[in-house]
Amino acid sequence: MIKQFYAILFFLSMQACIGIFPLDTQAQSNTNRDTINVRSGNKTSTGFWIHDKTREINISRIGPFIQMKKDVMATVDTSNFLVSTDEGLTWKAFPLFKDSSKFFIRPERALIKTKKGTLILAFANDKERAKWNWSKDTHDSPEAELPTYAMYSKDSGKSWSQPQLLHKEWTGAIRDIIETKDGQVVFSSMMMRHNPGHHAVVTYNSADEGKTWTRSNIIDLGGVGDHDGVTESTLEQMKDGSLKMLLRTNWGYFWQTSSTNNGLSWKNLKSTPIDASSSPGMFKRLKSGRLVLVWNRYYPQGKKSYPLRGGDYNFSAAPVSMHREEISIMFSDDDGKNWSQPVVIGKTTEPKTQIAYPYLFEKSPGELWISFAFSKLRMALYEKDFVQ
C-alpha cells in the first residue's frame, strides 16, 4: 500500500513536469555503439583514456584546488590545509583543527580564497555521521545525521577558526563555493528530508568573510529513496549579477534555479536542456568570461541505452542512468543560453572504475586542471583547444 501511494506521488510529480522539458533536450544519439576507441589515443598511468588535446598531470591530491599566489597552490585533505610550491608534487601540511579527533572532512568539500585573502572551507564531518538506518518498508532514515560546517583562516591557512556548525541534518555532499562581485561568499550543501526520505539542496551566504552565515530556502522537489531528490549542486554568477545553480537529479537532466539576492533565496526552478546521468557536474566562470561545464552525460557517446538503477523507492523512485564511464566538457559564451558541442575528454578502460565528482581549477588563464573525488584520473587541458 505504501509503495502504491509513493507511485501515485511520483506519477503526479512527473505529470507536473510535462511541458518543462523542451522537446530538443532528449539525450542525442544517432547510433547505438561506442564511438570512442580506447585502444588508440592517450592512456594515463592510472589506466584512463584521455582526449588527445589533454594531458595527464602528476598530482596525488583530489582537490578542490585554489591559487594562493604565483606558483603556490593549496587544497585540503581529511584534517589538514595543504600548500604546494611545485605544482602539486609535494605538499606542506597545516592542521585545520585544534582537536583532529573530532573532525574528518569528506571528499566532497568546497574551498575558496576571497578577494580580501580570507580562506573559507565548507565540509561535512564524517566523524559525526550517525543514526543512518534506512528502512525498506518506510523508505526513510528519519534520524540520520551528517553535519555541515564552515571555517575560515585570515593568515593564509596557518591557523583556522573553530568550525561553525550550520546544520546537523544528513549532508549528502558539499560541492561548490563562489564569491560574488560584491564580495559575498555562497556555497551549496544538502539536507535530507523525510516522510519519505529524499535529499534537498540549500545554500549558505556570508557577507563578512565567513564569520557568519545565512541559510537559503530549502530547494526540495520531493522524491523517494536514499539517492533521490535534488542533490550535489554547482553554482556560478551570471553577467547580470544573478546566480545560477545546476542540480543533480534522477530525471535525465540537470535542473536549474536562480537567485537575485546572492543565494539568500532561489526561484524559477526548471529543467535544463543538458542531459546528465545521476552524477554531479562542475560549472565555472573562466578568466576569459566563458562558462565551462564538466559532467557525465546520460548515455555514453554514441549509445542510446545504459543500464538503469533504482525505481524501487529505496535508491530512487525513477529508474536512472548512473553512467560514469565518460566525462565530457562544453563551453558557453552567453551565460549558458547556448553551449558548444560536448566533447568526451576522459573514459574508463577497466570494469568497475568511474570518472565522477569533478573539481575544476583554472591553474593559469585558459589552463584547466580537472581532478575527481572518486577517480584516480588527473588531467589538464587548454580552453583554446576546445573553443572556436
Task: Enumerate the language-model features and the residues they cover.
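Asp-box/BNR beta-propeller blade signature and adjacent active/binding-site loops
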Residues: 28-388
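Bacterial N-terminal signal peptides
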Residues: 7-19
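Signal peptide processing junction and immediate N-terminal pro/mature segment
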Residues: 17-28
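Positively charged n-region of N-terminal signal peptides that target proteins for export
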Residues: 1-4
